Amino acid sequence: MIVDFVLTLSLTLPNSVSDVGPLLTQIDFVEPVQQVLTYPPAGVENRLSGLQLPDGPLTAYETDFLADTVFFGAFAITKDFGYGFVTGANSLEAAREIAIEECLKQGPICLVYAEILPQGYAPLEIGQISLAPEAAGYYNNPDPAWGNFRAMAVSEDGAYSVVWGYGSPSEASAAALSDCGEFVIDDFPNLREMPCILVPFK
């Protein structure tokens, strides 16, 4: 006697706003930056799905994704529990998009399973940018030894660069943009461009 067991899993979109996390209007990081938002360094888990993850994805979720709860983060899954995730992006929207693109390597359709948000998070408005904890540490605590000719550049995807010791503001700005651009995510052909922009130091 042969018995075949078939497990069917259906992922459905949430019915209410509270089920999908903060609603986002796409606000690209653009210059000039009018306000830089930074938050306390510890993030908060925001699980958007009640699905129980199997052992493999659950281990990745708990030990890799949630390690140190670094915002902005997103964890996306396929219907067969393939997954992709990112932490340390500079915006929630970028984290969601990158996690989806990473997940799509495992299957044709992905949904965001969970996010890591900063405490007190509010969606960005035009002219605002937000920073992940590591970049925020440099922004909030510039070393006086860096002098006046210093610059910082960031990308929504989490890339950033801080440079100092240049002969002029324009040289520092060009160096920061060039260095930051070396770390921008460029291996997802369907991911929108997230170029580096200059951030005014305090």
Language-model region placement:
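Sec-dependent N-terminal signal peptides
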Residues: 1-15
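Secreted/extracellular ectodomain signature
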Residues: 13-202
